[in-house]
Curated annotation (Swiss-Prot):
It comes from the Eukaryota. Tubulin is the major constituent of microtubules, a cylinder consisting of laterally associated linear protofilaments composed of alpha- and beta-tubulin heterodimers. Microtubules grow by the addition of GTP-tubulin dimers to the microtubule end, where a stabilizing cap forms. Below the cap, tubulin dimers are in GDP-bound state, owing to GTPase activity of alpha-tubulin. Belongs to the tubulin family. GO terms for cellular component: cytoplasm; microtubule. This is Tubulin beta-1 chain. Its cofactor is Mg(2+). Pfam families: Tubulin (PF00091), Tubulin_C (PF03953). InterPro entries: Beta-tubulin_BS, Beta_tubulin, Tub_FtsZ_C, Tubulin, Tubulin/FtsZ-like_C, Tubulin/FtsZ_2-layer-sand-dom, Tubulin/FtsZ_GTPase_sf, Tubulin_C. Dimer of alpha and beta chains. A typical microtubule is a hollow water-filled tube with an outer diameter of 25 nm and an inner diameter of 15 nM. Alpha-beta heterodimers associate head-to-tail to form protofilaments running lengthwise along the microtubule wall with the beta-tubulin subunit facing the microtubule plus end conferring a structural polarity. Microtubules usually have 13 protofilaments but different protofilament numbers can be found in some organisms and specialized cells. Residues 424-445 are annotated as: Disordered.
Amino acid sequence: MREIVHIQAGQCGNQIGAKFWEVISDEHGIDPTGSYHGDSDLQLERINVYYNEAAGNKYVPRAILVDLEPGTMDSVRSGPFGQIFRPDNFVFGQSGAGNNWAKGHYTEGAELVDSVLDVVRKESESCDCLQGFQLTHSLGGGTGSGMGTLLISKIREEYPDRIMNTFSVMPSPKVSDTVVEPYNATVSVHQLVENTDETYCIDNEALYDICFRTLKLTTPTYGDLNHLVSATMSGVTTCLRFPGQLNADLRKLAVNMVPFPRLHFFMPGFAPLTSRGSQQYRALTVPELTQQMFDSKNMMAACDPRHGRYLTVAAIFRGRMSMKEVDEQMLNVQNKNSSYFVEWIPNNVKTAVCDIPPRGLKMSATFIGNSTAIQELFKRISEQFTAMFRRKAFLHWYTGEGMDEMEFTEAESNMNDLVSEYQQYQDATADEQGEFEEEGEEDEA
């Protein structure tokens, strides 16, 4: 089987990671003790992608839980599926990273990283054929961002030919618990650009807006945001977890989605949007699902796809529905909105259908877009970064852990280059070959 090793780092990473395992265990018919109580062979056919089979027909998540303080992992352990994880795979420190990227990357995190890599090796060695790694983390704090990116680069060194996939939560002033989030996020993106193959940008700004505007929650909690994240993560991993033809492993997904190696930041979307614990009264039709899925209000990144163009798109429909209708609707969207898809990648929209819907829904659709509009997210963080950096505010916390100001300057310019690259391909047409090779000549768009 083609296995994936899952790593969750930091408070946010552990919380969305724990939710992810709750949701997919439920979908695969696995209870909190790891026993199977399902009703369909489809649930077990590719169970080995995410679970190890242990003695007594127990299924154990191939998950590694990492943090620099014990608190969050204690609450995962005492949570609904806390007992399903392998106890040896909890790796934690005591000091905390204090929302400081440098502590996670260079000091505290660097001390813990080898014990994490031991567990990574152990899990990888017991795999039949490892396809790659997925990391859940946030970019705003210290551990998920600093130590998360340290782990990525160490794993990259040791497993250069395996796919590295991240679910990265982007910070937003609307749900902020730290002033230095733009610093942590910028130096993290600097790492992700170079060291990951696929990054799902899960943007707190967008999650907050969905809860507030669409779900009419006046004071959204992290629990509400994480409900949306787990629905999205379940959706984008459907093709990996259930039998099917399209994007059935991480590498095939990357080949379909990433036309240029640096431009691997995806905008996820989901339909229908529901709040926690709510039941759906009426199943949506395929046209409604398709229309909602492409709507900017359903995007998990606070970017408007209409401000950019799609390089590539993958769509996953779940539930019992007519394949013919799905194909018609997807063509319909492309024909009506052809100006929003780059014309120099023909057939750049791929669709998969999986029979098993998520819990509580008759059918759902998940959207993965590689859109040039994602530059709006990077611009937002870059502006916040620059505002503080030009005054050198809070820098002493980072230089005190041995970081150099140059690192900040480099990260800033790398992010601005990324924005320019997206802009360059947004403006590119099919007939002007040879004018842009690799580098965008303009400084900043």
